[in-house]
Every structure is written in structure tokens, then in C-alpha cells.
Amino acid sequence: VTFRESVSRFKGPFFAAEQTDRTHNIMDRRSFIGQTAAASAAVLAGAITTSSAVAADLQAIPLKDIGGKDTTLGDYKGKVLLIVNVASRCGYTRQYSGLEALYRKFKDKGLVVMGFPCNDFGAQEPEDEFGIQKFCKDKFDVTFPMFSKLGVKGAAKHPLYAALTGPEAAFPGEVKWNFGKFLVDRSGKVIARYDSKTEPDDAGLVATIEKALGS
């Protein structure tokens, strides 16, 4: 019997146990890596599913245009939408002019500007739908789609704005003032949000619109 064989025989049970432990450790590491990868994939899939669900919800929410006709964002499927909460007696009311210019510039490429009057901020939209429509036409020659008055915050928040600003939204958080803006791509996904101070001709806003349009 050689010295090496003697050592091997002496180590027998301990060596086998050590080898078994190493094998188990390797298997445990592989199992952990596999479980981690699976969990990451599940989280990613969940995020994608949530995003798709929010987009689908936006498309289906019942709305009324400013004339009282039933509609949904789904009626504008395949378009790029700029959703704006508007008011007639606000310091930002002048943005109607820029929004109309933006609409006329890009409407043939698929942009739809959407005005949603609300009276939530300083009671700056006291008019009814007829008065709002007349004001927008006479003062700014607005031709982009306008909708019935709705709430954008608090207990009276419309389901559209609940979806746009809720915890599962792409850009959660309450609208702070009139002329807040949400940009929705052709698939129905909200891709950008802008506050009241962002003018319709803002370079960043225009560039994002052009990218969404594929210009």
C-alpha cells in the first residue's frame, strides 16, 4: 500500500463528507441564482403588466366632450395625446394660444391636444361648457378637442385623473395647478408629465412630442 493510498483511506469518510458539502454549496448557490433570476423576471413582468393595465384603463375611461357626447381616449387610439387641465381665468390661460399652435403644427402627424376644463384651482373656471366653448373659440380660435368640466384632484377627482396621478401611474402625484400636461404615446402609455410653467413651445416638450410622433 502506498503512502498516498494510506492517506486516502485515512481521509475516507471525512473527505467524502467534505466533497458532499462542497457539492451542496454549489447546488445551493445555483439554486439561489436561479431563484433570484426568476424573482427579477417576475418583478419585471409585473411592472410591464401594470403599465399595460394602466394604459388599457386610460383608453376605456368614459368621458364626455364639451358638447356632451360620450367618448373615450380609445376613440383616439394610435394618436399621440397631450392631456391638459385648462381654465379660462388663470394666469396661464394664455397657453391656449400655444396649445392651439402646437396642435395645428402636428395634428397631421398624429398629435391631439385635449383640453379638460376644471374649477379646482382658485375657482378659475366658473363657466359652464357652453361658456367655455365660446370663450375658447372667440378668444383663441381653439380647434383642438375640448371636454366637459371635471375634477382633477381630491374627492371629486375624475377617473381619468385618478389613473393619471394615482400610485400605479407612470408619474404619480396630484396635479398642482391649471395647465398641467400629460403626454401619452400611440400605444396609450403616459411617457411624460409637465407642470403649468412648461409652455407649449418649450423645446423639451416639443422634442418629446416629435419623438413620440416619429418625426
Per-segment meaning from a language model:
Residues 1-26:
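N-terminal amphipathic/basic-hydrophobic helices that include classical n-h-c signal peptides
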Residues 21-40:
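N-terminal secretory signal peptides and thylakoid transit peptides that target proteins
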Residues 35-37, 42-60:
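N-proximal helix/coil linker or "cap" segments that precede and/or mark the start of modular domains
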Residues 51-74, 159:
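N-terminal "domain-start" segment that seeds a small globular fold
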Residues 76-91, 113-116:
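Short active-site neighborhood of thiol/selenol oxidoreductases, capturing the structured segment around
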Residues 92-158:
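Structural microenvironment flanking redox-active thiols in thiol-disulfide oxidoreductases
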Residues 162, 167-215:
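Thiol-/selenol-based redox modules, centered on thioredoxin-like
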